[in-house]
Amino acid sequence: MNNLKQGKFITFEGGEGIGKSTQSQMLYEYLQSQNTPVILTREVGGTIVAEKMREILVHEELLPMSELLQAIAARYDHMARKIIPALQEGHIVICDRFIDSTACYQGLELENGIDLVYNLHKTLMPSLMPDITFFIDVEPDTAIKRVNSRNMSNKFDIRGIDFYKKIYDCFKELSNRFPERIKTIKASDLSPLEVHELIKKHL
């Protein structure tokens, strides 16, 4: 853990419809029940400014570089105003999406974009990476069925199966690239409670 931090930083990653938000909430409630100082947040968003940026990012069609820089700007505000102060106070911070989502959703749209995402992060925010990341591994065919069954949507939800497969393959690649940090939870055939129990074993 970086010397800047006293708490622990946990992130949840994966494509659309895979249960990240559910697992983030379940872990948050579990840690609260253990009287553990914990906060739950999300990206893109987490602060008033970043949530306004989120509305543009998830609903408007931006140029690829504009979209990446919007995500990075929102993250900088989120980290400075919320994540870093909470970690310095000794809290566990649970974040629904972080840098790996930026790599897959925005980085893939640019030449050498994945490396660019991590290099930008190291330049602008060198002091903070997650201590542990849970990649919720749900097959794209299953994920898109889940998304199609719900009423709410954004521009990423309504893209086709080829997009879902591309994002899935990207997260698989990142889990191989950062095996010490990213823990893969195979969840296609598991209930939310079963997934939650697997996650707890890594804490």
UniProtKB/Swiss-Prot annotation:
> One GO molecular function term?
ATP binding
Q: Which Pfam families match?
A: Thymidylate_kin
Cite the binding residues for ATP: 14-21
InterPro entries associated with the record: P-loop_NTPase (IPR027417), Thymidylate_kin-like_dom (IPR039430), Thymidylate_kin_CS (IPR018095), Thymidylate_kinase (IPR018094)
Keyword Kinase in annotation: yes
Give the keywords, sorted. Answer: ATP-binding, Kinase, Nucleotide biosynthesis, Nucleotide-binding, Transferase
Superkingdom of this protein's organism: Bacteria
Q: Name one GO biological process term.
A: dUDP biosynthetic process
Cited function: Phosphorylation of dTMP to form dTDP in both de novo and salvage pathways of dTTP synthesis.
Family per record: Belongs to the thymidylate kinase family.
Tell me what this protein is called. Answer: Thymidylate kinase
The organism encoding this protein is Rickettsia massiliae (strain Mtu5)
Q: Which gene encodes it?
A: tmk
